[in-house]
């Protein structure tokens, strides 16, 4: 497996149910922004991966829809996916941020002025962007792998809610 060669000290794993089939998806958090996250699905004898932003993954359990939200330095995104025949299908993509992040402009309330795009088309405001996002993805009903988990300062990782270290996820997969 590709990930067996990595160091496992910072990684967090969890089996999640995105598409409500008989095989759970595997969520991996690599513990750093540079490492990001990945969601893996198993189909037709193969593992298929979708890289994501670090800590930006949420999903509607069993409804075959998930979100990758992320970005930095005034460049952000929301990507909405489903899984079809073992492939990750990008359903919608939103992007927002400063036209020039080296010279961010601010409104009278001190908020950054961003440009917003949904599925490649510019939209007029953050409100319109959020309305378009909410039409296809209910973030209020979505869950994340970290819901209900707590940080354990002795192990230096999040624990609870099914989160696993490397050895634990191997056991969880083997006993599934």
Mark where each language-model region is:
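Structural motif
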Residues: 33-39, 75-80
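Acidic/hydrophobic-patterned starts of short beta strands in beta-sheet-rich repeat architectures
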Residues: 19-30, 63-68
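A short, structured loop/turn motif at beta-sheet edges
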Residues: 17-23, 42-46, 82-88
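Beta-propeller blade termini
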Residues: 9-18, 56-65
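Acidic, small-residue rich beta-repeat scaffolds with periodic aromatic anchors
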Residues: 68-176
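Extracellular C-terminal loop/segment signatures of secreted glycoproteins
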Residues: 36-60
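Hydrophobic residues embedded in beta-strands of well-ordered beta-sheets
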Residues: 37, 47, 64-66, 88, ...
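N-terminal "mature head" segments of proteins
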Residues: 1-8
